[in-house]
Amino acid sequence: MAAAKITFWGAAGQVTGSMHLLEAAGARILLDAGLFQGKRKESAELNREVPFDARRIDGVVLSHAHIDHAGRLPLLVNRGFHGPIHATAATRDLCAVMLADSAHIQEKDFEYLQRHDRAGPESEPLYTMRDAARTQELIVGVPYRRLQHLRKNVTLEFTDAGHILGSASVDLRITEGTPHRLVFSGDIGRTGLPIIRDPNPPAGPVDTLIIESTYAEREHETVLGAEERLGEIIRRVASRGGKVLVPAFAVGRTQELVYALNELFRNGKIPRIPVYIDSPLAIEATTVFRLHPDIFDQTERLVESDSPLFDFSLVNYTRDVEDSKKLNTLRGPAVIIAASGMVEAGRILHHIKNHGDDHRNCILFVGFQGEHTLGRRIQEGDETVRIFGEERTIRAEIETISGYSAHADRNELRSWVRRIGGPIRRAFCVHGEESALAAMAEILKSEGVPEVHVPRHGESFDLV
């Protein structure tokens, strides 16, 4: 291979903001372009930074639609990027929902600040709905396991990452000069979860591996154990007249929870209490899920049993603001599932503000809570938090179920590496907090990878 290098512009030394720039075979290819989340001032500054000329990027390869992987794509378009964005068809369809929602929220927040004379340059939207629409026009749907030529000497193949609908691991082969194979794991999912197929890594020798590390130091409970705990928590909270408030990612986690609640109800393991999906984005995303049953894990069984995947008698989808507001004064037991998953935005903030001070209620975390997020602070026991500028006391019970995580744990990450099968010459650990990155590096070294790096933000490496 002729001179080539990789530069890590996001999810390097932290979880969010995934973006890696590959320069090889005369091309400049981005792997992901995600938003940073967490410390608000720091994240806002990083999100406005485009540390290269977007007009000179030849293309983007997108692993999946989560906003910390796709959320800066419209910003690149705003800054002059006009090349193709390669993603699976399901990721393309989810991006139509996710990116428009991201732009809409930014525009509405800015309008609110303008009305209250609090708007400054730092509060201007990163991009607009028009930028999101222009971005959507650039996305090319690529089927799993189909070879796609990005350039004369660069090919792409997607394999199932098992993280969310449409998620992919990226297999790039560079044939200019000495052949070089680069594999980017994307976010690796769990094995044995319903709906989404299990992770299926690219097989064979790898020259360069870029691998996520989110839960490299932890072990999750089993899926069966998670379902049993979910049922037990709902029964306990309902028996005292309380509500279960679940912050959940609109794409992936919400659909899995609805599926699990359906199973629990059908098997008589939870009482007949209402379940509210209070997330317009989740409702739109669920529509996209219904468009892609061909990539579900359990399609055949579900069709045979005539089981509705995302609908059952207890579920209520709240589509407008007025229906959502009615939940603020809701009496009696209920389950309320709302975005955002890390309690940084969305309708879950209203529900915790209105119901978080009642000891009968429970705030149930079922997904990763990033450093410095409101979700992490509540999860770790902060009794007083600020929501919409007001101090609020948290008296609700706090519970966490790790079995619904969409990220592989340390054993599943090790298994994924082993299933590659061939030797791995070099690896980079990304998408993790410091302790998780160190743990992932140790896993790779113990599996015989001779060269392992934990890159810092903006750090470049030659690939030779």
Place the predicted regions along the sequence by residue.
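Active-site neighborhood of phospho(di)ester-bond hydrolases with catalytic His/Asp-centered motifs
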Residues: 31-33, 57-66, 73, 85-88, ...
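Cap/insert and terminal regions of metallo-dependent hydrolase folds
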Residues: 169, 189-278, 362-367, 385-451
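Metallo-beta-lactamase
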Residues: 102-164, 293-331
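Core dinuclear metal-dependent hydrolase active-site scaffold
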Residues: 1-55, 134-197, 324-329, 335, ...
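Gly/Ser/Thr-rich loops at beta-strand to alpha-helix junctions
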Residues: 13, 66-68, 164-165, 249-256, ...
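Hard-cation-handling environments
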Residues: 231-372, 386
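Pre-active-site segment of Zn-dependent metallo-hydrolases
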Residues: 12-17, 24-137, 188-199, 226, ...
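Acidic/glycine-enriched edge-of-secondary-structure segments
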Residues: 33-37, 58, 179-185, 189-191, ...
